Each structure stands twice: as C-alpha cells, then as structure tokens.
Design a protein with these regions (language model features):
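Gram-negative bacterial Sec-dependent N-terminal signal peptides
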Residues: 1-22
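Flexible loop/hinge segments at secondary-structure junctions
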Residues: 24-351
Length: 351
C-alpha cells in the first residue's frame, strides 16, 4: 500500500519511466563529496541489514546534486540529494518549476572545514584575515583597495612561513565553497576593512544591492594561479598537494582524519579542528550537513523511508554511532530530526 497520495502527473511520471526502463528498486542518491563517505557507510549497512538493495550513492557536489534532485519526479530522477550547505531559494524555485514541491530537509550532523598541507611541511596557524589576505583578488591597504600582490604567506603575516602561496580550494559547485566563502573569506574581508571599502565603492541602486556587491567582491579570489579551484572531490585536492608539497588544501574534517599520515592540519584562530572543538562550538569554520528527500517518492521507491530513518538513527548518526567514528559531529537536536522524519515533515519556506 502506498504511504503517499499520488497526483495524476506523478502517476504518469512513474508509469512512463517504469514502462521505459522497468521498475527501479534501488535508491538513487547524489551530491556532496563531504556527505558522500557518510552516505556510503549508511548505504552499505542498509543493504546488509534490510530487505532492500544497497542504494546507489554518487558524488558530484552539493549544487549539482540539488540540481539533479529538482529535475522532476519519477523513477528516472534521483530520490535524495546530499548537501554540505543548505538548499538555496534558486534550487527550490527550480524544484517547483519541475513539479518537485514537497522536500524533506534532513540535518545529519556537523562537519568542519580544515586547511591542511603536506605532512612534512611547516606548521600553519591561520586566521580568516590571513586566508583573505593570501587568496583574495583585492585587499585593503592604507585605506584603499589594491590588487593582491602577496607572494608568500609571510608577506601576509610575518608569523607565517615564508612559503609561496598556493592554495587548492573547492570549486563553486561544492557546498564546501559556500561555507569557505562566508566563514573564511567574508569574515577576513570584514576584519581587514576591505568590506567597508567595497561597500563604499559599489554603484548599487540601494543598500541591498551595495551589500550584495561588497559580499561578491569579498568572495572573489585571485586569478594569478595562487588560488586554484578544484571541481573534483577531496582526493583530487590531496593528489595536488602530493605533487606540490608547498601547497595548502581545503578539506572536510572527516577526510583529513582519514589521511593524517599524509596531511598536517592548520589551526584557525588558534583552535585545532576536531570533533570535540566543533561540538563545543570552539572551531570557527564548521557547518551542518544535510540531505534532501523527495517526499513524493516515499512509498513508491522501495526502502526510501526506511533508509532515511536508518541514516538518522542513534546507531548511525548518534553519539557513539557508526558515523561518529568517521568524523561526523553528532547533532544535539537529532531526536527532533528523527521525529520529523517519522512524520515525513516537509521543510518550511526559507527565511
């Protein structure tokens, strides 16, 4: 028996895809490379412990996953999008345009964004101001904006190593990049006074437009080869560092913790990233992790509700659960998430 009332368009969508490709009995999941290892662990455990096939979990980035989720309804579309940043209004608008109107937002826990370099390299004690000063396209100097001319980290902060600046950062399709932009670049931009200069120089029609211009300028990175966008996953960033021992890369905490034999992590504002420092709110560059579920697929794609419930169970996402062993910081409000999943609660409009 179906658990969800189907509209005529949805029935047609499933009928069409079923006749074209046969009934699909495994879950299809895509999105965040940060959430990918957690989702893979859950998917494998789900396949071993339930009477359903192991879900198919792919990466591709948070933005790409949300876009795929919003392509429409039916067996030819994915069921879940993993995301290391919260869904955007533009995603919701795309979903609505394609008939995907009821999404369940599931917060699974927290993760940290870390800066790490070759294990044999020097120690780095960074601040958002340092990172902005090293990687931004423009910096503030003597009350004016100028093109970033820093060549070494010591040029930015004399206390840092006199090592050439080379940073591998997530590309714009990754949810990690959104958090990096806001919590590192934008924070450093404001601390240095560059934000105020960008704001004063904006030709925006109103205050909101000027603020948007200033934020965009804060997020703009240099294009001279010292800040390199990585569109692949963290393994690509790791391989770049292996080939460039003087480089720094941006990773998720869990990936770093699985590669401590190759990487040395930097502190941020004097705090080393760890499950403990993130759970206490001490480490400044952390973020919640999510996945988004098409409610209309529950009761149609076998095992979807069961997978979602299993993912947020105490055994998986709780303190001492399987995912905590791999670096996921448990959500103190996990019980509320579990209740929302059980009730199949759809997300409220974004504020």
């Amino acid at each position: 028996m179906l658990k969800h009332h189907l509209t005529a368009p949805l029935i047609a969508a499933f009928a069409l895809t079923a006749s074209a490709a046969g009934a699909r009995d495994n879950l299809q999941i895509a999105g965040s490379s940060t959430v990918l290892p957690y989702a893979t662990i859950v998917a494998e455990a789900f396949g071993e412990n339930f009477e359903f096939p192991t879900p198919v979990v792919e990466g591709g980035g948070s933005g790409a996953g949300r876009k795929k989720l919003c392509e429409g309804l039916g067996e030819a579309t994915i069921d879940i999008a993993n995301s290391s940043s919260r869904i955007k209004q533009s995603d919701i608008d795309l979903c609505n345009a394609n008939g995907v109107t009821d999404l369940m937002e599931v917060r699974i826990g927290f993760d940290g964004i870390v800066f790490a370099s070759d294990i044999n390299g020097p120690d780095f004690a960074l601040t958002p101001t340092d990172v902005f000063g090293a990687l931004s396209a423009q910096v503030a100097k003597d009350g004016a904006l100028m093109a970033n001319a820093a060549k070494t980290w010591a040029d930015v902060n004399a206390a840092l190593p006199a090592q050439d600046i080379l940073a591998f950062i997530p590309g714009t399709k990754h949810g990690t990049r959104e958090v990096f932009d806001v919590k590192v670049l934008e924070a450093g931009c404001k601390e240095t006074g560059a934000y105020d200069l960008f704001l004063a120089g904006s030709s925006g029609a109103d205050d909101a437009a000027k603020e948007k211009d200033a934020v965009a300028a804060c997020h703009a990175t240099r294009t001279d080869g010292m800040s390199v966008d990585i569109d692949g996953d963290y393994t690509e960033t790791l391989s770049r560092i292996a080939a460039n021992a003087s480089a720094i890369g941006v990773f998720g905490l869990s990936f770093y913790e699985n590669n401590t034999d190759k990487l040395k992590v930097a502190t941020m504002n004097g705090i080393a990233p760890s499950v403990e420092s993130i759970s206490k709110g001490e480490y400044p560059v952390s973020r919640p992790l999510y996945f988004y579920v098409k409610k209309a697929h529950i009761g149609v794609i076998p095992g979807l509700k069961e997978y979602v419930s299993f993912f947020v169970s105490d055994d998986m996402a709780g303190p001492g659960g399987a995912l905590a062993d791999y670096g996921l910081v448990p959500d103190p409000e996990l019980a509320a998430t579990q209740a929302a999943v059980e009730a199949e609660t759809v997300m409220a409009p974004l504020k």
